[in-house]
């Protein structure tokens, strides 16, 4: 038996495509959580790898798209690029949940915070993209950053790029209440570069949330159809390798 890496040419079904976009949201919120809790700008080689891929995708996700033809993998190279998000999403929906009334968050902080941020981003995305002014800000920022990259040797993690992504988040989602309150190293939050990185992470999550909604994603469906979502995640995990 030989395992071959997943081939991008293999099409995903509608639910899998949508689940993968949602995993992108959770990849962003997991990176947000990791950055905030460690209090360090660097989240390791693998963390930076996943973060850079999210930034690339977020700069190419447009306000409108043909949801009949778009695939989440159009914005990534392969399923492995979103493996952190798939694992985070799976952990969040399989962890024991709080017994508190109206609570739909896991008990464990390692799952609770990324899911809390993700749920907030899904709500914020709808408000941001229903406001033409915010949409225009995002489109203008995307064009500006894509041009800037040539000056920074296509370094998506350059402080100036992260600062622009962070400012775009502040100028859009950051203007809407309730704002996302990120928990982490209080001392590190005094560092502008650190907060820029966190806000840049949140911006990529906002963009992935927009793609998810374009693909037919619904917050209510995510909450009340966890079994189907888990099936889709597990199917995507198996698709990372083709067995012959």
UniProtKB/Swiss-Prot annotation:
It is a peripheral membrane protein. HAMAP family: HflD_protein. Keywords: Cell inner membrane, Cell membrane, Cytoplasm, Membrane. Its main location: cytoplasm. SUPFAM superfamilies: YcfC-like (SSF101322). This is High frequency lysogenization protein HflD homolog. Belongs to the HflD family. Coiled coil: none annotated. The gene is hflD. It is found in: Cytoplasm; Cell inner membrane. GO terms for cellular component: cytoplasm; plasma membrane.
């Amino acid at each position: 038996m030989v395992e071959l890496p997943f081939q991008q040419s293999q099409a995903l079904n509608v639910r899998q495509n949508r689940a993968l976009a949602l995993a992108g949201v959770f990849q962003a919120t997991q990176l947000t959580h990791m950055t905030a809790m460690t209090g360090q700008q660097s989240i390791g080689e693998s963390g930076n790898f996943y973060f850079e891929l999210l930034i690339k995708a977020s700069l190419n996700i447009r306000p409108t798209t043909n949801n009949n033809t778009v695939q989440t993998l159009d914005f990534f190279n392969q399923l492995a690029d979103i493996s952190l998000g798939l694992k985070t999403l799976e952990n969040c929906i399989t962890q024991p949940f709080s017994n508190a009334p109206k609570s739909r968050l896991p008990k464990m902080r390692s799952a609770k915070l990324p899911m809390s941020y993700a749920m907030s981003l899904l709500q914020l995305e709808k408000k941001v993209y229903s406001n033409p002014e915010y949409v225009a800000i995002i489109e203008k920022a995307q064009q500006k950053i894509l041009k800037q990259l040539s000056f920074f040797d296509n370094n998506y993690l350059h402080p100036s790029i992260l600062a622009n992504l962070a400012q775009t988040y502040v100028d859009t989602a950051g203007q809407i209440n309730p704002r996302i309150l990120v928990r982490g190293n209080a001392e590190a939050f005094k560092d502008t570069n650190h907060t820029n990185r966190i806000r840049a992470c949140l911006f990529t999550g906002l963009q992935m949330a927009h793609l998810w909604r374009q693909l037919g994603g619904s917050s209510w469906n995510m909450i009340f159809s966890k079994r189907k979502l888990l099936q889709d995640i597990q199917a995507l995990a198996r698709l990372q390798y083709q067995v012959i």
